[in-house]
Design a protein with these regions (language model features):
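Fe(II)/2-oxoglutarate oxygenase catalytic core
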Residues: 1-132, 136-159
């Protein structure tokens, strides 16, 4: 589980900078289990990712071409990960008073040539997405492989 020191560090960085990059925050055995789950999921569990939500959700290959599979607690790796993230959610609420009420997560698979164009990770007119987490499960990833997350400051400068 997340330690008090880890939670303090994450909350302080989010309050000061608006983001944090963490290496080796989750146990190695959990990462291996999540990667195994992600790659062993059958093809029919991955679906074309959409943009928007609820009635406004649509598949738009001009915006994103990845496929996603939702993580749930039906397997040990998913349960352990979601429990860890639930503790993080609770700790951030306690330290930052941000009112995050739930957490959802999915695996995303980007085939060669797939992408997700620059976007705001919140829905227009809603304030429900306050914190976003990204966990890379790629083994032996190198910068020339592409796929980096690019974060922009409010004035659009790349961080």
């Amino acid at each position: 589980m997340i330690s008090e020191q880890q939670a303090d560090r994450i909350a302080a960085a989010l309050a000061a900078e608006g983001y944090i990059i963490l290496d080796d925050i989750l146990p190695d055995d959990l990462l291996v289990s999540l990667a195994s789950q992600a790659t062993s999921s059958t093809a029919n569990t991955y679906k074309a990712a959409g943009v928007g939500r609820e009635q406004g959700m649509q598949h738009n290959a001009a915006v994103r071409k990845d496929e996603i599979s939702w993580i749930d607690s039906s397997n040990p790796a998913g349960k352990e990960y979601l429990d860890w993230m639930e503790r993080l959610r609770s700790e951030l609420n306690r330290r930052l008073f941000i009112g995050v009420f739930d957490y959802e997560s999915h695996y995303a698979h980007y085939a060669p040539g797939a992408y997700y164009k620059t976007h705001l990770d919140a829905f227009k007119g809603n304030t429900n997405r306050i914190v976003t987490t990204v966990l890379y499960l790629n083994s032996n990833w190198r910068p020339e492989n592409g796929g980096e997350l690019v974060v922009y400051s409010p004035d659009s400068d790349c961080i």
